[in-house]
């Protein structure tokens, strides 16, 4: 699908111009092994990754900085009834995919086709807007282009085959003022929830945002940047690059994913707080000012909403945004334990495939839609708690509580916790040259797999030696 400059007014009106500019330049490849290892640490009950670093997660701040999508706006919560979708699609874009074929034998059922179209069908019919197209035709092609992009990126379902009808329906009116940023994060949270609770592979959601979030903060599976390709903003601030431009052209990994997955698992098990880039977007006056390029203003337009504790809504999916659990990522005081907020198992159970009878999600989730609107209203009215700056001692106390309260390792430990030294003062250790290099690098070797290997090897050899002693042998005879 090629972009046509005639689409720009409609993409701008829909609030998607910064994001479309990002993805049409081509997006960096996902490191599937690193993402899988990271998702192993996801906990649906807190919407955070549980690591030795404490809790970490993708927040509204990250979505805004990486994608340039608006946070302020309306939750995307509508009627997803697909009854008569073919007639509606025909009216909206002028054509529909062919009907499924009739079965050749009477005893076979008719092929079931999801409401929507395959990406192949869309590409074959809407790849290029005709040069002599009138305004209505250009508008149609722009609508289909946006449908194609959001279905493949923001709302990817893990199959890479179909663009659901509901996302095209959401683009019926361009100026709907959707809160695309909160919608994208809600969908990503739900995909992470589902992926962490099932035994089969596959995950959807905006993996572009998740990947760049990980690369910015964690030195595990981080690629090396090669260069920046020229970015023509056409003197339009909304066409300036987002923070994702820092990862414009990368060196791709060609290693065996199964081997790298084991390595990444070990590294994530061993990563420590001082090896994390906690505030990658800068601090104070330098916040949001990358040295290499000018940042798109949409990245920071809604920064006053980043700390909202609110429901994030994407049709059937309602997921809570809990930034107070990861205040260290904002350079703020981390209390312990963080105030508990129930993420509600009943909400997690809501699924458009399992609850087919529920169609009008705007009515079903009205309470949460109102909560989101009130959260925005309270922030804009200046009604929010005063937040304190990061305190190293408080964060150390939080870590002591956190590590005693949850599981942070995926791999079976090779040692008993009681043999470890007392916790160090993390902010002091962070100044050590090794940890500074790790934060900026792309691996925590040798402290992760190597340390685990050495300890396990020593334990195995010690066990072998002890078995040769009189006390260790069953017959009472030993070599010593």
Residue ranges and their predicted role:
Residues 1-480:
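Structural stabilizers in ordered domains
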